[in-house]
Amino acid sequence: PPLATRGIGGKPLDAFAIDTIRLPFDNPWDALLFTAGHDFLPDGSALVCTAHGDVWRLTGLDASLENVTWRRYATGLFQPLGLKVVDGRGYVIGRDQITRLHDLNADGEADFYENFNNDLLSAGGGHAYATSLETDSRGNFYFTKCAEGTAHGGSLIRVSGDGGKLGVFATGFRNPNGLGIGPGDVITVGDQQGGWVPETRVDVMRRGGFY
């Protein structure tokens, strides 16, 4: 059954109006709610993925935020840390693959988890995360992969819009966990401090670049 929480609207005069929505920590599955990615569906509801493998669908995201409902939409994913809605369907990036979620019987829960692309190489280390799923104006998908001993480690990865091809777009990162694509398909990536990276930074990407 859906779970209900409430939210608090942000101040509209601030540079960014940040709405705060309470998480349904008291839920039938005792599911942990380490939120990791979100995007909005055409009807104004939202999909939110959590690091422990769930995707939740939120409704009631109106101006009042008095009755925000949460329904677990998908579960069992491998540490999903990025989510993107394209043509009304949720795409989730996990350590293992991009998964496209389908609700075939329109009951509010995904019943088909499609392997959209699983060409990603992963050594399974403690920091072998894939994060931050976004798309460009041509429909290509992008995500970041933390450094490890594979050809895809420490890279910005691009996947074709049909899921048929995966390749490295840029490399040299440590543990990137932030990706944005702006006007003109300008791509920015945020790397994290540690090891050979003296401070957290944001870089503007160029194809084939080393950062």
What are these regions (language model features)?
Residues 1-211:
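Beta-propeller domains with acidic blade repeats across secreted/periplasmic ectodomains
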